[in-house]
From Swiss-Prot:
GO terms for molecular function: ATP binding; ATP hydrolysis activity; ATP-dependent protein folding chaperone; unfolded protein binding. PANTHER family: HEAT SHOCK PROTEIN 90 FAMILY MEMBER. It comes from Coxiella burnetii (strain Dugway 5J108-111). Keywords: ATP-binding, Chaperone, Cytoplasm, Nucleotide-binding, Stress response. Belongs to the heat shock protein 90 family. The keyword Nucleotidyltransferase does not apply. It is found in: Cytoplasm. GO terms for cellular component: cytoplasm. Molecular chaperone. Has ATPase activity. The gene is htpG. This is Chaperone protein HtpG.
Length: 633
């Protein structure tokens, strides 16, 4: 076994360099948050030690009195944040202080490359954390040792926040981490004990761990004994905010607790605080973030709530309290009815967990319902951030399907905008008296849906159609068949059936069918295996053709999604529908030249496929045939 080098210099990952630059230049107006972030890290370290010590008490090393110490030295211009939490090994120092978590590296790079995200958005998504130290410091030294390791396995990390950092082995008799900030010339304000106390009160009063500082000496106090150990005092409340009555907690305190537990830079969008008493006793404090995290679509990523048992931290990311479609929710569950040594495996089959989960879901859905009813602007912000995730709900949560459906929002032909602000209840309130279905179309983009020829008869009759273009929409409509007794109907599948709304058109179509029987046979003969069928339609008013799919087959949009994800399936063939009143169809009907007829048949099918969003298998042949028809005209 080779010994670790005594000292070495390593380079930061490229993403860390960029994050350091952002932190140093973009957070200067709110520079005091460095203390909040470093205290939060120390608090997390204590939580991890408590949890691991449940199964290995020796990790406490005869010191179970966990604290955070804050000190400063005016002469040397330093601030020190020290804890006796879990600490770090050499490998953990490199992983935690030299890299961004691998799950976030690619997303961070993509956001930077796009140049779309504001600096605050990047910082909010990836966390400021330890790197906030460089807002006020031009040199940072970290000394740490992991609990359970030998005293000579301590590590010292040092950097000026530029391209490199140095590591060396040190002796560290006590476990935990010490962060020493060498302040920039312009940051003397933080060498004031009153200023530091004010920041702690503002951001970290709720931290469960005692935060300790030296007592401020009053003027005239005896200062003769220079060697006397200064007296210490706890400068935060050090209690669990969530156990206090709601009327005793200020909004700012709720917001700061959120930033601590979610490691977010922004205020939450909304929250709900609830205490349940009776046979089952637990407290929940649940937050909805203002912005989606970078890994929201990684269903395997870390998610969940912080779990406490009788105010003792048990685990981060306890995913069993929230279904996948609410994976964006952050917060705390504190139960009196779970054992302290509960594991993730036991969480899966615990009846108490199931009851708490049902309560958490109920609270979040009620919060969203309240926002949707009483604060439409805030709900619109929520929908923009998390609407696509909520659309997974009807497939995953049958018990709450109707409540979730009532929260869904869509674009529609009623509004000339891609903003998703139409609820299913809005749609029903505008339905025609004779109408008994909720009509929708799913397309690759909003523009493609809005301009689909399939909408022509609906516009003619002033029937609203929901315009869906999110990737999750096919999954949604497959599991949401009806709402308030009205069935959902795709206008891109099956034959058109508007009931009493289309009596005249049906009569007219029947007249055309005999006259166009020969033309339909010719189309079938020419197009062969490319199509399933050809038929007359009355759904078109301006376009010559369109394609649809059988009622029980997958839509073209769903088939394209499956192809993109590499799925193996039996592809459905389109049905070509023709508008018997369109001049192009009448021209083709009278075409006597077989070659030209074949070109027209191909052209009419391909343009219908393009309008449906399909990518042509042979676009060059399509262009060639089109050019030949233009030259013949």
């Amino acid at each position: 076994m080779s010994l670790q080098p005594q000292s070495e210099t390593l380079s930061f990952e490229a993403e860390v360099k960029q994050l350091l630059h952002l932190v140093a230049h973009s957070l200067y107006s709110n520079k005091e948050i460095f203390l909040r972030e470093l205290i939060s890290n120390s608090s997390d370290a204590a939580d991890k030690l408590r949890y691991q010590a449940l199964s290995d008490a020796a990790l406490y090393e005869n010191d179970a009195d966990l604290k955070i110490w804050i000190d400063f030295d005016k002469d040397n211009r330093t601030i020190t944040i020290r804890d006796n939490g879990i600490g770090m090994s050499r490998e953990e120092v490199i992983e935690n202080l030299g890299t961004i978590a691998k799950s976030g590296t690619r997303a961070f790079r993509e956001l930077l490359a796009e140049k779309k995200a504001e600096d605050s958005q990047l910082i909010g998504q990836f966390g400021v954390g330890f790197y906030s130290a460089f807002i006020v410091a031009d040199r940072v030294v970290v000394r740490t040792r992991r609990a359970g390791m030998k005293a000579d396995q301590g590590v010292e990390w040092e950097s000026t926040g530029e391209g490199e950092y140095t590591l060396k082995n040190i002796d560290k008799p006590t476990r935990g981490t010490e962060v020493v900030l060498h302040l920039k010339e312009s940051e003397e304000e933080f060498l004031d004990p009153l200023r530091l106390r004010a920041i702690i009160t503002k951001y970290s009063d709720h931290i469960l761990l005692p935060i300790v500082m030296k007592k401020i000496k009053t003027s005239g106090a005896d200062d003769e004994d220079k060697n006397e150990t200064p007296e210490e005092e706890v400068v935060n409340r050090a209690n669990a905010l969530w156990v206090l009555p709601k009327d005793k907690i200020k909004d700012e305190e709720y917001k700061e607790l959120y930033k601590h537990i979610a490691h977010d830079f922004e205020d939450p969008l909304a929250w709900v605080h609830n205490k349940v008493e009776g046979k089952l006793e637990y407290t929940t404090l649940l937050y909805i973030p203002a912005r989606a995290p970078f890994d929201i679509w990684n269903r395997e990523g870390q998610r969940g709530l912080k779990l406490y048992v009788k105010r003792i931290f048990i685990m981060d990311d306890a995913e069993h309290f929230m279904p996948m479609y609410l994976r964006f929710v952050k917060g705390i569950v504190d139960s009196n009815d779970l054992p302290l040594n509960i594991s993730r495996e036991l969480l899966q089959s615990n009846e108490v967990i199931n009851k708490i989960k049902a309560g958490c879901v109920k609270r979040i859905l009620s919060l969203l319902e309240d926002l949707a009813k009483n604060d439409k602007e805030k709900y619109a912000s929520f929908w923009k951030a998390f609407g696509q995730v909520l659309k997974e709900g009807p497939a995953e949560d049958f018990a709450n399907r109707d409540r979730i459906a009532n929260l869904l929002r869509f674009a529609s032909t009623h509004n000339d905008t891609d903003e998703q602000n139409v609820s299913l209840q809005d749609y029903i309130s505008r339905m025609k008296p004779e109408q008994n279905r909720i009509y929708y179309i799913v397309a690759d983009t909003y523009t493609s849906a809005k301009n689909s020829p399939l909408l022509e008869v609906f516009r003619k009759k002033d029937i609203e159609v929901l315009l869906m273009s999110d990737r999750v929409d096919e999954w949604l409509v497959a599991h949401l068949n009806e709402f308030e007794g009205k069935s959902l109907q795709s206008i891109a599948k099956g034959t058109l059936d508007l009931g009493d709304l289309e009596k005249e058109e049906k009569v007219e179509t029947e007249k055309f069918e005999k006259d166009f029987d020969e033309l339909l046979k010719q189309f079938k003969e020419v197009l062969g295996e490319k199509i399933k069928d050809v038929r007359i339609t009355h759904r078109l008013t301006d376009s010559p053709t369109c394609v649809v799919f059988d009622e029980n087959e997958m839509s073209g949009h769903l088939q394209r999604l499956l192809i993109q994800t590499g799925q193996d399936f039996m592809q459905a063939k389109p049905i070509l529908e023709i508008n018997p009143s369109h001049p192009l169809i009448l021209r083709v009907k009278n075409e006597s030249d077989k070659t030209r007829f074949n070109r027209w048949a191909d052209l009419l099918l391909n343009q219908a496929l393009l309008a449906e969003g399909e990518q042509l298998k042979d676009p060059a042949s399509f262009v060639k045939g089109l050019n030949e028809l233009l030259l013949d005209s």
